[in-house]
From Swiss-Prot:
Keyword field: Virion
GO cellular component: viral capsid
Stated name of the protein: Penton protein P31
Function comment: In association with P2 and trimeric P5, forms the spike complexes located at the 5-fold vertices of the capsid. Essential for viral infectivity.
Classification of source organism: Viruses, Varidnaviria, Bamfordvirae, Preplasmiviricota, Tectiliviricetes
Subcellular location: Virion
Gene expressing this chain: XXXI
Provenance organism: Enterobacteria phage PRD1 (Bacteriophage PRD1)
Amino acid sequence: MNVNNPNQMTVTPVYNGCDSGEGPQSVRGYFDAVAGENVKYDLTYLADTQGFTGVQCIYIDNAENDGAFEIDVEETGQRIKCPAGKQGYFPLLVPGRAKFVARHLGSGKKSVPLFFLNFTIAQGVW
């Protein structure tokens, strides 16, 4: 199993017109794996070291890929599925520690840009 290294992630301040506890922020996740391989994202390190808490939304850019992209919230069992050739914002149910498992269901090795957000954006897929 490929485990995403949180030491290679950084928190980026963003502005959306509202105030959360630490201010609106995003974390760029790097998904780069072969089809069916699970990649774990444990954002608790970022919560402990950089104050990134309360993940509420994820942006998934699966526009360039031939299969669906899935990401599961470990604590709640919620599964988000972004169809092949699509991208969008998806609300997340993360009541506590932000831990996720992602996979791509297409063929070959794929890269899928992800952004974890600590604020909400209305769901939209295009």
